[in-house]
Amino acid sequence: MERNFTNMIPLAPLAILGKNKNTRNSLGGSLLQSLAFLLFTLLFSLSFLAGNSAYASNIAGPGVKSLSSQKELRAVWFSYLDWMNMPKEEQAFRAEAAKVMDNLQKNGFQTLFLHVHSHSDSYGKKMTVFPYSKFMPGNGSFDPLEIMISEAKKKGISVHAWFNPYRVSSSMSKWENIPEDSIVKKWSRTSGEERNVLLHEGQYYINPSRAAGREALLASIKELLDNYAVDGIHFDDYFYPRVSLTEEGKRFDEPEYEEAKRQGETGSLTEYRRNQVSLLLKQVHSLCKERGVLFGVSPVPNLQSLRSSVAYFLDVDKIMASKDYVDYIMPQMYHGFRAKNGKGQEAPHAYMRSLGDWVNLTNSTGNQVELMLGLGLYRAGSAVWDGNPVSEWFTESDILKRQVEEARKTGIVKGYAVFAYQNLLEERAQRELGNLRSVFQN
């Protein structure tokens, strides 16, 4: 219902103005009275709007929460592997969930990217489009997702629901172990729908080129937003699998492309595939905007890889130049400052080179999409190969701290996320984490 401000102005101050005997019958008094009334009305209106945020947001127009007006985002990815490490009994789970939030706060984080859909499954008991995930503790005796969100809200921690959009199977979730009543299994044995799910190099994927796959993903996101109080939806880099120049690679969704050409499609196969991903992103973003939550994606950091014709097919230049696809993009900047390729040269994904590429892209596309960075806490204290005789991750303990400092110098990076929660607890990561915590206090 439309609010009537005139009827909401308190009467007592107006009565006082009207009874002011010193000014009532003089021109000066009349002017002062009018000015006082106008000043009061203005102050009241401003205080009313400030105290009624829901109405104030409606005045600004419908849409998602603004990233620009928020403080620096500091998030942690909580993956299906982290879910597997949680207690199986409800009370113990609830206690551990509270501890998770304490660990986030202690280390300067205020946002959780919580896995809710990793292998065409669902992590919430109130979700039905995809089957309940085997990775969730409790065997269905309670709702771990609901508890995690509840414990997060108690501590003022935002939760973004993390989806892997197309992946169906992996070494951790084999096809033969997927429930027979799963929508992907039903597709595979239903005439006319069997191409909704595709086998490629030993693993299964939802076909990005089929409307049924997009509709199922959208329905799953919608039911999550209907039933769980999350603040955002988050996709990572699992878009198209790598399709080589082999016949199998060409065939992945080539039949859909050929049908599209018969219907008037004029673009190349690469352009067609990019458009399929863009279509899904646009539909998800529209849903999120309608619900007032954020939507972002976290692709690989190498722009050359994203622009290739053999993998991902995320049209990064297109989505960065528009407000219609995502609210933020968070490249997975997991490599260090001295990363090298096999020839001993600076790698395209070396941190400063990659940071410069993303800053340039963000600026050249008019800053339509907020830029954030994913950081590789999981590498801290390890001898992970980075092209050097001895990995910088093994010899140094302030890499993430310096990465944040360099990103802040750009003036456009709006936040960070570290992968992953389990690494917050590892002894080898504590010095790196302590240094990161110190820069988060600034």
Predicted segments with their positions:
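Active-site-adjacent "subsite" loops/lids of carbohydrate-active enzymes
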Residues: 71-73, 77-91, 161, 166-223, ...
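The substrate-binding groove and active-site-proximal loops of carbohydrate-active enzymes
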Residues: 81-91, 129-141, 200-215, 266-276, ...
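Aromatic- and glycine-enriched glycan-recognition loops and surfaces
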Residues: 89-106, 133-153, 216, 275-282
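Catalytic domains of carbohydrate-active enzymes, especially glycoside hydrolases
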Residues: 95-120, 228
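Aromatic-lined carbohydrate-binding/catalytic grooves of carbohydrate-active enzymes
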Residues: 109-141
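Aromatic- and acidic-residue-enriched segments that line the glycan-binding/catalytic groove
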Residues: 125-136, 167-199, 238-262, 388-392
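Polysaccharide-binding and catalytic clefts of secreted carbohydrate-active enzymes
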Residues: 188-303, 307-325, 332-335
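Substrate-binding cleft of secreted/luminal carbohydrate-active enzymes
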Residues: 325-344, 369-442
